[in-house]
Amino acid sequence: MSLLTPLIWILILLPIILLALIKSEKGQLKYLGFFILYFLADCYIQQLSKQFISIEFMGLKFSWVGKILSLLMSLTIIYAVSKSNRQEIGFTTKTNAKKQVIIGLLFFFGFLFFDLIFKMILFPKGGAFDLETFAFQATLPGLTEELAFRGIGLWLLEKAFPPKWTFKGIKFGWGFIMVTVLFGLAHGVFLTANHELKFDLITIVYLSLISSLSVGVLRKFSGNLIYPILGHNTINIMNAIIRIL
């Protein structure tokens, strides 16, 4: 994947950013710059580590090093900010009201059930069990991506664009929309090393409206990152299980 790919993701997101700038109440726009810098740094840490740090000699095929470095960077930022900011990021064991948590869980599991049926029909079956696949999918992607997207990323964007829509006592805003869409873009758009653009619209729409939206709602209604991390990893494990049925 070309190093230009993360810039393409931001470029595609630009219309939503511009719309947010027009429609939002005045926020602290420096945080939009911080978000872009953080997002690009996270992307390039993972990309460059994959290029320059090989662990194939250990028989491992997934990007363990990149994900661990991403995790370390996120944790460094989280522990560098104040306790109140950590709670805003979602790095806390505190939750919202029980009723709100239940709403988030019902929303997530409703989407998860749809996701299960859809993938049971479409996913190729009969793959071999692979321990590394399960170990990786059950841990690092959910942990690192939730810290990045619905943790630090969402926190920075909500500083830039204060949420103004309220549903069941939970505030939503342009930041929520941006991280939801950006997650889909990061899984459905990439520029190859030969500068060939791959644009999978179905993947972008599906991941944005199903996976990303469901864990995003779970994050907002639960009030912390524990629930979306567990939810994200549940989706990944479910995908791996379906492929070996």
Segments from the language model and where they lie:
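N-terminal, membrane-interfacial amphipathic/helix-forming hydrophobic leader that caps
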Residues: 1-85, 237-245
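Residue-level signature of transmembrane alpha-helical entry/exit and packing/kink sites
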Residues: 2-6, 27-35, 63, 67, ...
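Generic low-polarity alpha-helical segments
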Residues: 30-32, 48, 91, 155, ...
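Compositionally biased, intrinsically disordered low-complexity segments enriched
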Residues: 48-49, 102, 189, 234
